[in-house]
């Protein structure tokens, strides 16, 4: 009989987005409890050691974070297994580096460097809108934030632009056709496109049809769609590839063309 929370995570059971090698040991770092789900986060130890190569071992990561050098969304984090997740801004003041955790078209967390201007805000998806005690309206975002007295026009599935320093809502983007979105789950993870239509299925999952800038169309569940811009203008900078996934044939043609150009 299980007693209490699990404390370990086997390497083979770790999310594929972490890109851990199969033979690098038995275990993977189990993320602490926090604002993002275990399968949708990237622990700081993997970000600093495996991605940025700032440390060789977990012990070195511990020494880095205990010096209070790493900030996530403007707050110092000293837990090496702190779960940073989609849209979080990771800042390292000692090296003047700013990153936003975002998916590439292969569905992996990519190292996406951003400008100091862009690091002042983040986008949050609205998960719930409700009324609390004394009829105070509030909303809950995808990263576990509760914001009181939001604009009454903000509804579930919309995105808000949040000022990280003040945690105030700067702007919001409605979930509607023609707006730019990124896919945060499923087989189309990391793709970017504009919403074409939404199929309602009461009692089941609503399906959203999306078209990317090359004209490819695909469909996904509503809860995998994260609005990132009005019209075709994105509120955040996108990683290399701009969220456009090429087919295998298109990737091959691109490689051949690059090889010919290099000769």
Swiss-Prot record:
One of its GO terms (molecular function) is structural constituent of ribosome. Keywords: Ribonucleoprotein, Ribosomal protein, RNA-binding, rRNA-binding. Residues 42-104 form the S4 RNA-binding domain. The keyword RNA-binding applies. InterPro entries: KOW, Rib_uL2_dom2, Ribosomal_eS4, Ribosomal_eS4_C, Ribosomal_eS4_central_region, Ribosomal_eS4_central_sf, Ribosomal_eS4_KOW, Ribosomal_eS4_N. PROSITE patterns: RIBOSOMAL_S4E (PS00528), S4 (PS50889). HAMAP family: Ribosomal_eS4. Belongs to the eukaryotic ribosomal protein eS4 family. This is Small ribosomal subunit protein eS4. The gene is RpS4.
């Amino acid at each position: 009989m299980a007693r209490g929370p699990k404390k370990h995570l086997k390497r083979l059971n770790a999310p594929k987005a972490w890109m851990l090698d199969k033979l690098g040991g038995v275990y993977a770092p189990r993320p602490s409890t926090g604002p993002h789900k275990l399968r949708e986060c990237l622990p700081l130890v993997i970000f600093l050691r495996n991605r940025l190569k700032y440390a060789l071992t977990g012990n070195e990561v511990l020494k880095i974070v205990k010096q209070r050098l790493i900030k996530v969304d403007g707050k110092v984090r000293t837990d090496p297994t702190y779960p940073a997740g989609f849209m979080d801004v990771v800042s390292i003041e000692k090296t003047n580096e700013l990153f936003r955790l975002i998916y590439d078209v292969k569905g992996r967390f990519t190292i996406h460097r951003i400008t100091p201007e862009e690091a002042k805000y983040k986008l949050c998806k609205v998960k719930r809108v409700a009324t609390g005690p004394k009829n105070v309206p509030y909303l809950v975002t995808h990263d576990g934030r509760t914001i009181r007295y939001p604009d009454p026009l903000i509804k579930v599935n919309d995105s808000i632009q949040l000022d990280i320093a003040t945690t105030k809502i700067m702007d919001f983007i409605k979930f509607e056709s023609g707006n730019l979105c990124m896919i945060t789950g499923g087989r189309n993870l990391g793709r970017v496109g504009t919403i074409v239509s939404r199929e309602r299925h009461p009692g089941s999952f609503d399906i959203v049809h999306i078209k990317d800038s090359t004209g490819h169309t695909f469909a996904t569940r509503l809860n995998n769609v994260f609005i990132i811009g009005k019209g075709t203008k994105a509120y955040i900078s996108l990683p290399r590839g701009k969220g456009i996934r090429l087919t295998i044939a298109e990737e091959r043609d691109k490689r051949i063309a690059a090889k010919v150009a290099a000769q």
